[in-house]
Amino acid sequence: MALGSAALFVLTLTVHAAGTCPELKVLDLEGYKQLTILQGCPGLPGAAGPKGEAGAKGDRGESGLPGIPGKEGPTGPKGNQGEKGIRGEKGDSGPSQSCATGPRTCKELLTQGHFLTGWYTIYLPDCRPLTVLCDMDTDGGGWTVFQRRLDGSVDFFRDWTSYKRGFGSQLGEFWLGNDNIHALTTQGTSELRVDLSDFEGKHDFAKYSSFQIQGEAEKYKLILGNFLGGGAGDSLTPHNNRLFSTKDQDNDGSTSSCAMGYHGAWWYSQCHTSNLNGLYLRGPHKSYANGVNWKSWRGYNYSCKVSEMKVRLI
């Protein structure tokens, strides 16, 4: 083998054999003799050195993405009540309303632009506010309803005190109360309208030129004007100038109690031609004259489905 003058040649011969690991190296340097190096097998690993000191703390990594929310835990115990807060400032005063400026009748409400039938507050002559049903649809509107029967949901066979104060429900049947009716009908001349319906779908009415009841000292005596007409006919005039009677106060002209005998409360004479506060018997009935009767319309053996008594200031 020829060797260049300025080159370094390394000839490496590696011999691998099972169980052997020598490696023979022959080096030939220009101008020197050949040098042969024989490398032996690696020795056994030395013992582990001592543990090095901990390195300096690295920079904190960036926060990872939020994990999936866990399930809601059970409700904890109720906490103690907090301290009472500071009282708020007084609000602005609402629009003033008094008996001097407030409406006195449903007719007055109608003239003020209240055209829907419903419950309104009016003011009686003694300044008492009174919630009343205003019929704004029938015969020109402006009627104050003081009696209504329509489904038998309210018991009308009651005592003197109940009729004095009034009873029933705004959602159904009611009697406005004799004291209230007296106050309403002493403000001036009020006309009366009685609206009736039967269970066959027929409707009719009776109308009177004036209607007033006196105070309790006069036993709520009825003062009735002329019958003006209506298909229901006149079944109230015979009760004119009669006193009001209930099951516990008999003021009629009969030797027996008309209120007890006909299960009602009315301006009975001897005894009646109308009994609109009688038993709610739902149409034809075999019993005599103890239903919601108006003799001139359906007779003594037919109890009306609906009756409404209402007044309007003229």
Swiss-Prot record:
Region feature Disordered, mapped onto this chain? 49-101
- Keywords attached to this entry: Calcium, Collagen, Complement activation lectin pathway, Disulfide bond, Glycoprotein, Immunity, Innate immunity, Lectin, Metal-binding, Repeat, Secreted, Signal
**What species is given as this protein's source?**
Mus musculus
What family does the Swiss-Prot or TrEMBL record give for this protein? Answer: Belongs to the ficolin lectin family.
Q: Which positions does UniProt annotate with glycan attachment?
A: N301
Cellular component GO terms held in the UniProt record: collagen trimer; extracellular region; plasma membrane; serine-type endopeptidase complex
> What's the name of the protein?
Ficolin-2
Q: Which residues bind Ca(2+)?
A: D250, D252, S254, S256
Provide the organism lineage as a comma list. Answer: Eukaryota, Metazoa, Chordata, Craniata, Vertebrata
The UniProt function text for this chain reads: May function in innate immunity through activation of the lectin complement pathway. Calcium-dependent and GlcNAc-binding lectin.
